Amino acid sequence: MRTDELGKQIEAARSRYYRLLLIVGPFHSGKTQILLQLVQDAGCPYINLSLVLSQKLLEYPHRIRTLRLPRIVEAIIDDTVGDTVLLDNIEILFDPALQQDPLRLLQYISRTRNIVAAWSGKFEGRTL
C-alpha cells in the first residue's frame, strides 16, 4: 500500500468511533517501512511499542502489570504530539503473561486519536 492511499484511509478514519487502521502482513513484509515512510511524508509520531512498553512495565511488580497495561499504553499515546500515532512492534501485547486482548486494547486507545498499527499475521475474509 502506498502512503498516499494510507493517508486517505487515515482521513476517513477520523469520522469513525474506532479510529484504528491495521497494516497486516507477515513478519518482514514491509510494514515498518510503510510506517517510517508515513513519518517522513506526514510527520506522524512513531512508537516502537514493545520497546517503550517493556521499559515502562519494569516499573511495576509482575502481579500489577496486567491491570496497569491499558493505562500505561494510553499514557504512552497521550505523551505524543499529533492526531495520528504510528505503532510498530506491538507483539508485547500478545504476551500470554499480560492477559490482554490486543485488538480490543488498540480499539480502546483509538477512540480519541488515529492509531495506525503494524499487525503481524494475515487477514482472511473477516478473520484476523
Question: What are the language-model segments listed below?
Answer:
Residues 80-98:
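Conserved P-loop NTPase "ATPase switch" module shared by AAA+ and STAND
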Residues 51-78:
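Short glycine-rich substrate-engagement loop in P-loop NTPases that contacts/grips substrate
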Residues 1-16:
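N-terminal pre-Walker A segment at the start of P-loop NTPase domains
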Residues 16-33:
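Walker A/P-loop nucleotide-binding motif
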Residues 40-56:
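Conserved catalytic segments around the Walker B and adjacent sensor/switch elements
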Residues 34, 38:
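Hydrophobic positions on the alpha1 helix immediately C-terminal to the Walker A/P-loop
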Residues 13-15, 76-80, 107-113:
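Conserved catalytic network of the ASCE P-loop NTPase/AAA+ motor domain
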